[in-house]
Amino acid sequence: LGKYFRLNNLKVTGYYDVNENLAKEAATFTETTFIEDLETIVKISDTLFLTVPDDLITTVWNQMKDMSLEGKFICHCSGALSAGDAFPGIDKCGAFGYSVHPLFAVSDKYNSYKELSHAYFVIEGDEKHREEIAGIFNNLGNEVRYIAAKDKVKYHCAAAVCSNHVVALIQ
């Protein structure tokens, strides 16, 4: 997403990862900044995308939740996990949680961004600022759909099955 955002003139603050080499690699690839610690990237960003494996989203959230998050948008890209499940207690922090899932198979972190302009993005989360999150992708020319938290697992299952059938047909 970072490369896609940068190529479309959206500001990307930078990258943080517990593995500094991965964050430096992402920052170099996107021509942004390597951020040395989680607290700094949270402080200087208004919207944060936690692009970590699904089973680590809540772990990262738990490291962030006691920081100053008032008014910030916290997003993850899981197809199955709802924003509420990923970010328990986010409303108490004054922040807003979103699941922003591209209906798109990311097979190569260095090249998949080239096709993201054709992806649908499915958004679930706090209704208060949902239109602002959707606007990011609408302004890039992407189609956006909203989904209820209760439908996330069914949606993810359908997406995975369809994707696997297409791959099987191609092979």
Predicted feature descriptions by range:
Residues 1-36:
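NAD(P)+-binding Rossmann beta1-loop-alpha1 motif at the extreme N-terminus of oxidoreductases
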Residues 3, 24, 58-59, 84, ...:
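Alpha-helical elements of the RecA-like P-loop NTPase motor core of helicases
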Residues 6, 24-28, 65, 91, ...:
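Class I S-adenosyl-L-methionine
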Residues 8-9, 29-31, 70, 92-93, ...:
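Short, structured coil segments at secondary-structure junctions
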Residues 13-17, 74-77, 121-124:
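Short, hydrophobic beta-strand segments that form beta-sheet elements in well-ordered domains
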Residues 22-26, 112-155, 162-171:
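Internal alpha-helical scaffold of NAD(P)-dependent oxidoreductase catalytic cores
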Residues 30-33, 91-94, 115-117, 163-164:
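Short, hinge-like loop/turn segments at secondary-structure boundaries
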Residues 34, 38-112:
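Rossmann-like NAD(P)(H) cofactor-binding subdomain of soluble oxidoreductases
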